[in-house]
Amino acid sequence: MTLCPHHWKIGGVSLNSKLWTAKILAEQPELIKQVHKNYFKAGADIILFETVPSLKEAKVEAEIAEEYGYDYWISFSCLSENIICEGIPIAECATTFAKGYPHLKMIGVNCTKPEYITGLIHKIKENCDIPIGVYPNSGEEYD
């Protein structure tokens, strides 16, 4: 990362965008891979992919971790007790990661309204047996 006068940049890309990873994932997926590889190379024992808004992003992150044999967890942000921010059902996300991801140590939900958590946990449990983690927000509304 390079410190710029009023914002951070990674690989020359401004982090001022609220969803910089999603934007860069679509435009420059190799940059996302390199950023996460650097975290592993720095010596992290486990990487926490948090507030993941899309299944596509989660798959890229999982691919990186699995390629290098690093343990990780993926935590989705959700719009309701059924869907992640992208509009895909959490059940589909859980099914996607149910098998074939040996280094995935937890699938979860964060930055999500507390009233949605119980339903999300049930849907994840119905579709995979990976340990579940949650840490809801305090209920505030964000842009």
Describe the role of every protein-language-model region.
Residues 1-143:
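Domain-level signal for soluble alpha/beta catalytic cores
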